[in-house]
Design a protein with these regions (language model features):
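Class II aminoacyl-tRNA synthetase catalytic cores and aaRS-like
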Residues: 6-8, 13-19
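Extended, well-ordered protein cores
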Residues: 2-5, 20, 27-127, 132-369
């Protein structure tokens, strides 16, 4: 693995087990299947979130029990965002830069997470908190070459007040959760992944807590194990050392108020300010229907101390940008009448496959050049 000189100091991701000494007021196991986080009890019971059973009523997502819990749920998102910002200075710098031009108003298109599809640590483990707060599971996406699958989740319909904020206090973001199909990996890679997920115990039941606290639910791996996984799957290596951390947030470009509401203008603006974008398949990723336009930076690097005492640079997270164009049947609507449901929804395999490369060593090497 290439060694990188670090210009950025970043906190080392702690192990979940190292947090046992924290105050019970933050995290207290009240029963086998429930825990209290930030003063709220969350069910941890095991569920089967298959494509059919995970879905709430698609026709009435606003009927899900969300009212009364909205403040708590937004606090969960905010703590995930804070951990993400603290570890990814490029993302924070770009968000601050865009806010300075766009009257401090940024909305998120989606949040994304990575998981291991084994021992209960896959998509279901991270999806639970979102399903519990009214999100609806939507389409599955498959990435055969990368041995990945993903689902995206649409947010509940929550009316916004006139003084609604931006970021996590604005319209709720979509959620994109992917998982590595561990059973398709080599026996050697499977052994490493299973070793650490099994050591996690019930950690998978508290994926959202781990993400909000910025910690792993398993012990730190050795550097040699990280290297071995990276040779076969950079996604696997990333997940081994980052766990349930927020992989990226995505700015909703068309919701910006300035000239940056066009993704080509935004890309140019970002590059002119010294930030490099993921060039896999071209900087701008366009869906076959031409209605979903995406781009992203490459991941920040951070120093990570492995279990054997070796400190190395590892990829952290990145920031994405998405512009959703108006669907053909609504193209004649007056601009002030266009709402989010009039625009292209969902995700595109071809786009997402290239966005995944934002944490690849190839892109990091190009970025360092």
């Amino acid at each position: 693995m290439l060694r990188f000189s670090l210009s950025i100091e970043s906190r080392i991701l702690p192990s979940f087990s190292s947090l046992r000494s924290l105050s019970p007021s933050l995290f207290f196991s009240s029963s086998r299947n429930n825990f209290v986080f930030c003063g709220k009890e969350i069910s941890g019971e095991t569920r089967n979130f298959s494509a059919m059973s995970a879905c709430r009523d698609h026709r009435h997502p606003q009927d899900c029990s969300f009212l009364g819990g909205e403040s708590f749920f937004r606090n969960i998102l905010a703590t995930m965002e804070t951990v993400y910002m603290n570890k990814n200075p490029t993302a924070k710098a770009i968000l601050d830069l865009v806010r300075s031009v766009d009257d401090d108003c940024i909305y998120y298109d989606h949040f994304a997470f990575r998981t291991f599809g084994v021992n209960g640590h896959g998509i279901d483990s991270m999806a639970k908190v979102f399903l519990d707060f009214g999100y609806v599971q939507r389409e599955e996406l498959r990435f055969p070459a990368k041995k990945l699958k993903a689902f995206w989740f649409s947010p509940p319909k929550v009316p916004l007040t006139a003084n609604a904020g931006s970021g996590v206090n604005g319209p709720l973001p979509r959620i994109f959760i992917s998982e590595l199909l561990v059973d398709q990996m080599s026996p050697e890679a499977q052994k490493i992944v299973r070793k650490y997920t099994e050591l996690s115990g019930n950690g998978s039941m508290h994926a959202a807590v781990a993400s909000a606290l910025g910690c792993l639910t398993w012990e730190k791996p050795t550097y040699s194990e990280f290297q071995q996984l990276a040779k076969e799957s950079e996604y696997a290596a990333w997940t081994l050392v980052n766990g349930y951390a927020l992989n990226h947030v995505t700015i909703s470009v068309h919701r910006l108020k300035s000239h940056l509401a066009n993704i080509k203008n935004l890309n140019q603006f970002i590059e002119e300010n010294g930030f490099k974008l993921n060039s896999e398949g071209g900087v701008l990723k366009v869906s076959p229907d031409g209605l979903l336009l995406q781009s992203s930076t490459v991941a920040n690097l951070t120093s990570f101390e492995f279990a054997d005492g070796i400190s190395e640079s590892i990829p952290c997270s990145y920031i994405e940008f998405a512009e959703r164009l108006i669907l053909p049947q609504f193209k004649n609507l007056p601009e002030d009448k266009v709402e989010e449901f009039h625009r292209r929804d969902g995700f595109e395999v071809g786009n997402a496959d290239k966005i995944f490369e934002s944490t690849s060593m190839d892109q990091l090497t190009r970025n360092a050049a």
